[in-house]
């Protein structure tokens, strides 16, 4: 750790710990200092000017003194230099020797990379338009097989953007468990179904096994040329062609786009096909708007960086091992899962980018749920448990339904009430000596309040969390773009399948009990 980094952390640790209520009492401008609204200068797919998001960190323990310390830490870790490397296409993924160019897919990056991304997007749009125009016959269903970032991002976007009837009914299948694929088959007519195979390498065992079974399903149900119903989304187009996919239906994406950051590439094909090209393009526009903010704002004015300051304060100063996200919007039901992969796969590391051990705790356990469902399941622990868990609340001012406005009013009042209750605490006992009804309070939360959950806002929201994850990584000295932690278990699974390796007695017994020996 450099002297500048040590000095910054020393300053952060010296800041007096005060309760949230004390912080509000001490500063009448606290809300205005720690609440920031970002609005987009772009139109939503519906033609109206898109709105924005209000970010509120006033219910966290951040103070001017803490922010001064974290800004010094950002300088010590050369955050500005790391940001420039990310956005200019430098090889910032040092362990794998390549760039991380997901922002280039939406127009922010090295000129040559942006031009390549635009060309690839044009190719995808042409295919989407052709399918919608009947070039592949009647298409009512798409079975999209992928795993990890190749599946979770598209499914999140489709859930958020296809409340109205989808242009094409999309079923995203990621699990190797055959039940998942059979459920998709049951909902689709083989004669009007396409298969999308999403795999960066086109070798991922779960995806390729599911793809082979999907082709077999088409063949055994009267489709003479099942490969003629396949679209491939990959950074290895040669492998897709070798698999039997016609080159005109192979949609490549750049090798420098990581899986969990790949929604913006051809991996977004099912979103464009199911929700419409305008919706997909709206997501790109919203993400680019967030890119522009991230690229230009400095210090605490940079909202993804400000979020990272709060994250690091709770993990490294307050010792929090988890952070929760609760979406008070049914359309964002998969957002906690998406963030779980984004943050834990990116920053769940024990060594820094230079190979030395990390200096403290890294990514917390990211978890969460949906709205009032979660209140009746896990909020007991948040309010009265022994774990201090910072919470992010996400909601939309505009409802996503056409029902009685009472539905949405109750939803929002619950969202805001939970943040207030976590902070203030209270005593609900008729007898004040009953400790079981005491709420200690001083539990931190942040709120992200969207004007509306349209495609532009969704893109901005996802990009915000990407940049937040990157900012955390820079401040910890981590490379967030590799994921070697997923490899060992995959290798051992192959060894069990081949029967060519000895394992511990417990694993051997399980293999035998399952009849796999």
Curated annotation (Swiss-Prot):
Compartment annotation: Cytoplasm
InterPro entries reported for this sequence: G6P_Isomerase, G6P_Isomerase_C, Phosphoglucose_isomerase_CS, SIS_dom_sf, SIS_PGI_1, SIS_PGI_2
Catalytic residue list: 345, 376, 490
Taxonomy, superkingdom: Bacteria
GO biological process terms on file: gluconeogenesis; glucose 6-phosphate metabolic process; glycolytic process
Keywords: Cytoplasm, Gluconeogenesis, Glycolysis, Isomerase
Pathway this chain belongs to: Carbohydrate biosynthesis; gluconeogenesis; Carbohydrate degradation; glycolysis; D-glyceraldehyde 3-phosphate and glycerone phosphate from D-glucose: step 2/4
Enzyme class: isomerase
Molecular function terms, GO-annotated: carbohydrate derivative binding; glucose-6-phosphate isomerase activity; monosaccharide binding
CC terms in the record's Gene Ontology section: cytosol
Function comment: Catalyzes the reversible isomerization of glucose-6-phosphate to fructose-6-phosphate.
Protein name as catalogued: Glucose-6-phosphate isomerase
Source organism: Erythrobacter litoralis (strain HTCC2594)
Source taxonomy: Bacteria, Pseudomonadati, Pseudomonadota, Alphaproteobacteria, Sphingomonadales
């Amino acid at each position: 750790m450099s002297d500048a980094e040590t000095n910054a952390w020393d300053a952060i640790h010296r800041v007096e710990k005060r309760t949230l209520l004390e912080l509000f009492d001490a500063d009448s401008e606290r809300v205005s200092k720690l609440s920031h609204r970002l609005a987009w200068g772009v139109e939503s797919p519906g033609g109206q000017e898109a709105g924005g998001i209000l970010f509120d960190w006033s219910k966290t323990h951040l103070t001017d003194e803490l922010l001064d310390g974290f800004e010094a830490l950002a300088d010590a870790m050369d955050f500005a230099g790391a940001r420039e490397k990310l956005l200019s296409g430098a090889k910032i993924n040092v362990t794998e020797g390549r760039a991380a160019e997901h922002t280039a897919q939406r127009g922010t990056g090295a000129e040559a990379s942006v031009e390549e991304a635009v060309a690839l997007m044009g190719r995808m749009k042409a295919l989407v338009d052709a399918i919608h125009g009947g070039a592949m016959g009647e298409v009512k269903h798409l079975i999209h097989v992928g795993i990890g970032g190749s599946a979770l991002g598209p499914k999140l976007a489709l859930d958020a953007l296809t409340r109205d009837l989808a242009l094409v009914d999309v079923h995203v299948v990621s699990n190797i468990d055959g039940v998942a694929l059979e459920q998709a088959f049951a909902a689709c007519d083989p004669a009007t179904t396409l298969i999308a195979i999403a795999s960066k390498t086109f070798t991922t065992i779960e995806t390729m096994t599911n793809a082979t079974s999907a082709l077999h399903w088409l063949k055994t149900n009267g489709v003479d040329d099942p490969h003629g119903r396949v679209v491939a989304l990959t950074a290895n187009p040669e492998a897709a062609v070798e698999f039997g996919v016609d080159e005109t239906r192979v949609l490549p994406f750049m090798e420098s786009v990581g899986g969990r950051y790949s929604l913006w590439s051809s991996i977004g094909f099912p979103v464009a096909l199911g929700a419409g090209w305008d919706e997909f393009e709206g997501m790109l526009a919203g993400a680019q708007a967030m890119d522009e903010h991230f690229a230009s704002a400095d210090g605490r004015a940079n909202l993804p960086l400000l979020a990272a300051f709060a994250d690091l304060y709770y993990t490294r100063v307050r010792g929090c091992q988890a952070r929760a996200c609760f979406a008070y919007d049914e359309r964002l039901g998969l957002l906690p899962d998406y963030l779980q992969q984004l943050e834990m796969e990116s920053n769940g590391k024990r060594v820094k980018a230079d190979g030395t051990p990390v200096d403290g705790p890294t990514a917390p356990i990211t978890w969460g749920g949906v709205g009032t469902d979660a209140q009746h399941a896990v909020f007991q622990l948040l309010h009265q448990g022994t774990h201090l868990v910072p919470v992010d609340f996400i909601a939309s001012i505009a409802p996503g339904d056409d029902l009685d406005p009472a539905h949405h009013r109750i939803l929002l009042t619950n969202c805001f009430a939970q943040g207030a209750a976590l902070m203030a605490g209270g005593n609900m006992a008729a007898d004040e000596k009953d400790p079981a009804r005491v709420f200690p309070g001083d539990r931190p939360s942040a709120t992200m309040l969207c004007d509306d959950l349209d495609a532009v806002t969704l893109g901005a929201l996802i990009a915000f969390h990407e940049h937040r994850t990157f900012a955390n990584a820079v401040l910890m000295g981590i490379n967030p773009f590799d994921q070697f932690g997923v490899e060992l278990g995959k290798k051992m699974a192959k060894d069990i399948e081949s029967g060519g390796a000895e394992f511990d007695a417990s694993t051997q017994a399980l293999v035998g009990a399952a009849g796999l020996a």
